[in-house]
């Protein structure tokens, strides 16, 4: 257990033990993590979905190692890697211009502030998690702007329709796409509403971009005016990107930061994007994830455990019937060395081969055995589905409901 976490001002998201202390890992390779006791874990967290290729991918590692020696560019100025990364992103995600940043949070903030300046409109209508920046904190009164001019519509298209009645004040609608709790039809209606109102649509694909396919996951559904990607770019290295209309992103010309040309990060992005462009890692992830889900769903059913699984092999989420069962599920998984992202989305990497999957399936079977006291419990209901979706989306899952139901759900979930 780390002795220095109390010195850290932040409280970063990371795997923690039953006493909420950070777990300490000493090594990582492929789909495996090793903790300080020598225990080996199978990693479904993968740095919150940013390790797409697997830990220590040899191609990325070799590129980074070479750049670290000074043999492939310098932090002082431009290198060929800058051009390569820009060209790859443009080919994969489109747009007239592309900007580079160090985190998804920074990229989204820069993108929406640029759009706000370019349009001259004050409001941002938001749905989903856009990073740690306080600008996204919801206001105390639902459907009212916060101090930064952001209004959250919580993925409810009825609320968005109300907010778009005065489109002349709206700089952009900003959404973080989710493919576990929202259907393609939801996105098509969102695009229709934005187009009808003449409002810019920003897709914050920090999490899902490049993971589902070689490009934006909503390219055909939303055709966003501005996009942001990050986690699929560099296999865990600190880089993100913004792209879209030259007019809307013109204010980014003022952006510069000291580590812009840092060669190891650019090398990682270039190497990872070359792989991502083939579609092979995404296919491997989907196939491995789907196989695990088939086993997990059957194991849960055979054990009569009231746990659903939302999503597919690319990203999925456990939906336990109760919070007590949810806590027990993740506790049992920890005991068996399955490192899940507690309460959030699970994502395998392309390093999940036959041996890893076989071991993961055996461990999950033992997880279900540990949960035997919960067999035959109350079934999963809508309250559980909304609660779990809220944990991953910061918003409401797609389901039929009226305005009164929406208001009640928001009051309860925001209070929790």
Curated annotation (Swiss-Prot):
Top EC category: transferase
InterPro entries noted in UniProt: Aminotrans_3, PyrdxlP-dep_Trfase, PyrdxlP-dep_Trfase_major, PyrdxlP-dep_Trfase_small
Entry-annotated residues carrying N6-(pyridoxal phosphate)lysine: 231
Required co-factors: pyridoxal 5'-phosphate
Pathway: Antibiotic biosynthesis; neomycin biosynthesis
Catalysed reaction equations from the record: neomycin C + 2-oxoglutarate = 6'''-deamino-6'''-oxoneomycin C + L-glutamate; neamine + 2-oxoglutarate = 6'-oxoparomamine + L-glutamate
EC number(s) stated in the UniProt entry for this protein: 2.6.1.93, 2.6.1.95
Molecular function, one GO term: pyridoxal phosphate binding
Gene Ontology annotations of biological process type: neomycin biosynthetic process
Keywords, ordered alphabetically: Aminotransferase, Antibiotic biosynthesis, Pyridoxal phosphate, Transferase
Pfam families noted in UniProt: Aminotran_3 (PF00202)
Entry keyword annotation includes Lipid biosynthesis: no
Main function: 6'-oxoglucosaminyl:L-glutamate aminotransferase that catalyzes pyridoxal-5'-phosphate-mediated transamination for the conversion of paromamine to neamine in the biosynthetic pathway of neomycin. Also able to catalyze deamination at C-6''' of neomycin.
Family: Belongs to the class-III pyridoxal-phosphate-dependent aminotransferase family.
Protein name as catalogued: Neamine transaminase NeoN
Native organism: Streptomyces fradiae (Streptomyces roseoflavus)
Taxonomic placement: Bacteria, Bacillati, Actinomycetota, Actinomycetes, Kitasatosporales
Gene that encodes the chain: neoN
């Amino acid at each position: 257990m780390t002795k220095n976490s109390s010195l850290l001002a932040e409280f970063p998201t990371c795997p923690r033990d039953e006493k909420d202390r950070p777990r300490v890992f000493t090594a990582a390779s492929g789909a495996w993590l090793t903790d300080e006791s020598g225990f080996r874990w199978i990693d479904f967290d993968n740095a919150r979905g940013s390790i797409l290729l697997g830990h220590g991918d040899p191609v990325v590692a070799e590129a980074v190692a070479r750049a670290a020696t000074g043999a492939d560019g310098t932090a002082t100025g431009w290198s060929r890697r800058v051009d390569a990364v820009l060209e790859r992103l443009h080919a994969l995600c489109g747009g007239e211009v592309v900007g580079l940043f160090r985190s998804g949070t920074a990229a989204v903030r820069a993108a929406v502030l640029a759009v706000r300046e370019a349009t001259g409109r004050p409001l941002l209508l938001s749905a989903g998690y856009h990073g740690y920046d306080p600008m996204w904190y919801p206001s105390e009164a639902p459907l009212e702007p916060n101090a930064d001019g952001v209004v959250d519509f919580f993925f409810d298209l009825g609320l968005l329709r109300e907010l778009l009645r005065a489109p002349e004040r709206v700089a952009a609608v900003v959404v973080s796409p989710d493919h576990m709790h929202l259907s393609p039809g939801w996105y098509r209606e969102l695009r229709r509403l934005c187009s009808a109102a003449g409002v810019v649509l920003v897709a914050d694909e920090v999490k899902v971009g490049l993971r589902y396919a070689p490009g934006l996951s909503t390219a055909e559904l939303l055709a966003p005016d501005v996009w942001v990607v990050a986690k699929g770019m560099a296999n865990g290295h600190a880089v993100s990107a913004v792209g879209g209309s030259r007019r809307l992103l013109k204010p980014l010309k003022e952006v510069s930061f000291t580590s812009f040309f840092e060669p190891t990060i650019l090398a990682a992005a270039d190497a990872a994007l070359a792989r991502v462009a083939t579609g092979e890692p995404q296919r491997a992830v989907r196939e491995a994830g789907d196989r695990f889900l088939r086993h997990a769903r059957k194991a849960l059913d055979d054990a009569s455990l009231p746990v659903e699984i939302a999503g597919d092999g690319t990203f999925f989420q456990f939906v336990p019937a109760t919070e007590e069962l949810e806590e027990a599920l993740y506790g049992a998984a920890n005991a068996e060395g399955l490192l899940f992202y507690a309460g959030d989305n699970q994502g395998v990497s392309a390093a999940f081969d036959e041996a890893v999957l076989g071991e993961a399936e055996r461990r999950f079977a033992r997880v279900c055995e540990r949960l035997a006291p919960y067999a035959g419990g109350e079934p999963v209901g809508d309250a559980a589905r909304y609660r779990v979706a809220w944990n991953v989306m910061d918003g409401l899952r797609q389901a039929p409901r009226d305005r009164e139901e929406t208001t009640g759900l928001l009051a309860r979930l925001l209070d929790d």
